[in-house]
């Protein structure tokens, strides 16, 4: 009798683990039927429920989310966001979190996808590669423009090279250049 009880105790958790998916879906139908879904929600963003059948409202950045609740509006984070646990519980004892942006280099639902862009920066929702033209050098400009010609050349901050001779000439004629303020 003890062996039957022990076997039952060991098999029940194994059965429950097999029933739960990575998405924590509960009571999912064998086949999705869109007629079983609630009417289409009117919200800013929607995501598929944990079963992958029906669209539900998604929580936005900074809003409360639940990782283990399925089929309820506003409980899952939208694309490009993930549910960051906040070590708190609601009145029912369910753990909740706050929707936060995906870390750089990841995108999609729950930030599961990896960005394959050359720059490593992609849209957190879609994964589309982002380009920042103000960080890219123009191809038509001379490549030696950004190289210092001598070891005493300086930069003025506007992309122009300031030679040591020019600084010495300005310092000799300008009384302002002779007086330096002590740093605080």
UniProtKB/Swiss-Prot annotation:
GO terms for biological process: angiogenesis; positive regulation of cell population proliferation; positive regulation of hepatocyte growth factor receptor signaling pathway; sprouting angiogenesis. It holds the Pfam family IGFBP. Glycans are attached at residue 156. InterPro entries: ESM1, Growth_fac_rcpt_cys_sf, IGFBP-like. SMART domains: IB. May contain intrachain disulfide bonds. Disulfide bonds join 28-51, 32-53, 37-54, 43-57, 65-83, 77-99. Induction: By TNF and IL1B/interleukin-1 beta, but not IL4/interleukin-4. GO terms for molecular function: extracellular matrix structural constituent; hepatocyte growth factor receptor binding; integrin binding. It is found in: Secreted. SUPFAM superfamilies: Growth factor receptor domain. Monomer. Involved in angiogenesis; promotes angiogenic sprouting. May have potent implications in lung endothelial cell-leukocyte interactions. This is Endothelial cell-specific molecule 1. It comes from Homo sapiens.
């Amino acid at each position: 009798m003890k062996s039957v009880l022990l076997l039952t105790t060991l098999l029940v958790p194994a059965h429950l683990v097999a029933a739960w998916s990575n998405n924590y879906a509960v009571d999912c139908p064998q086949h999705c039927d869109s007629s079983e879904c609630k009417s289409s929600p009117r919200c800013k963003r929607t995501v598929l429920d944990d079963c992958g059948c029906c669209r539900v409202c998604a929580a936005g950045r900074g809003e409360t989310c639940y990782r283990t609740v399925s089929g309820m509006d506003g409980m899952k984070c939208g694309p490009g966001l993930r549910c960051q646990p906040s070590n708190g519980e609601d009145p029912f004892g369910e753990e909740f979190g706050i929707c936060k942006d995906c870390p750089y280099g990841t995108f999609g639902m729950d930030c599961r996808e990896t960005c394959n862009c050359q720059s490593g920066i992609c849209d957190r929702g879609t994964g589309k590669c982002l380009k920042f033209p103000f960080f890219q050098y123009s191809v038509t400009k001379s490549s030696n423009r950004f190289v210092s010609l001598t070891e005493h050349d300086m930069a003025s901050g506007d992309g122009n090279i300031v030679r040591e001779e020019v600084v010495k000439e300005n310092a000799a004629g300008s009384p302002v250049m002779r007086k330096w303020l002590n740093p605080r």
